[in-house]
């Protein structure tokens, strides 16, 4: 979203990428006005970005990226201005081959992908080997939800069910609840209560108010 503490460093970061010789394409996701701001900044400073640069507007909850191994989608947050978070989900992973066994049984190399996909193996002599015998279970796929400035609404946890890592802002201590409500932020206690509902493997807190000089207060 377009509160200054979340984007004002972006023009400098992009300029630094250029100075360091970046060549790969940069894809930026955000509200349309962010693109207008960047164009204004670059035009005012006569900056020409030398690497491929593409902007994708985020204006609703939708899928933003889908590849062979990851899916990224946006989720609407509840803040004073339009604000979105993101959910990153790894795709299910393939089974892992038991290298020692397949070597002993002389399973041909061309069949390895079939094993990874869960197929059983029939040897040249007609003997059936179950996939579970020749492979190990796939490694766990992880997911990460990034929720920046947000005043938690009822049923918001439904959008986050199943994520393994949850980042959620926790600007205030709970004694500042009236302030949190007024500014559309979340308290540490509320973020923790959200995590109890979502049940992630890990909760990460951040976006603390500058009034707190030491994290132990939180």
Protein language model annotation of sequence segments:
Residues 1-19:
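Di-metal (Zn2+ and/or Mg2+/Mn2+) metal-binding site signature of metallo-dependent hydrolases
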Residues 2, 32-33, 101-102, 148-150, ...:
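Active-site metal-binding loops of divalent metal-dependent hydrolases
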Residues 10-13, 38-41, 156:
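Hydrophobic packing residues within well-ordered alpha-helices of enzyme cores
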Residues 24-27, 142-144:
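Short active-site oxyanion
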Residues 25-33, 204-205:
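Short internal beta-strands
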Residues 46-58:
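A glycine-rich helix N-cap at a beta->alpha junction
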Residues 60-62, 152-218:
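Binuclear metal-ion centers of metallo-dependent hydrolases, dominated by the metallo-beta-lactamase
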Residues 70-146, 150-159, 165-167:
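Active-site-proximal loop/helix segment associated with metal-binding centers of metalloenzymes
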């Amino acid at each position: 979203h377009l509160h200054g503490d979340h984007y004002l460093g972006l023009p400098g970061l992009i300029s630094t990428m250029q100075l360091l010789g970046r060549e790969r394409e940069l894809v930026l996701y955000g509200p349309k006005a962010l693109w207008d701001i960047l164009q204004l900044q670059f035009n005012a400073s006569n900056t020409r970005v030398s690497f491929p640069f593409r902007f994708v507007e985020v204006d609703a909850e939708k899928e933003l990226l889908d590849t062979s191994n990851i899916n990224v989608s946006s989720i609407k947050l509840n803040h004073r201005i339009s604000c979105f978070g993101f959910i990153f989900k790894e795709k299910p992973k393939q089974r892992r081959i038991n290298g020692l066994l397949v070597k002993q049984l002389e399973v041909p190399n061309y069949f390895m992908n079939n094993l990874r996909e869960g197929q059983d193996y029939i040897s040249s002599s007609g003997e059936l080997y179950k996939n579970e015998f020749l492979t190990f279970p796939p490694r766990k796929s992880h997911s990460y939800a990034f929720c920046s400035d947000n005043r938690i609404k009822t049923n918001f946890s439904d959008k986050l069910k199943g994520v393994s890592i949850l980042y959620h802002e926790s600007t205030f201590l709970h004694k500042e609840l009236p302030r949190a409500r007024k500014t559309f932020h979340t308290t540490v206690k509320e973020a923790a209560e959200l995590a109890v509902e979502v049940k992630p493997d890990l909760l990460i807190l951040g976006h603390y108010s500058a009034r707190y000089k030491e994290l132990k207060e939180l």
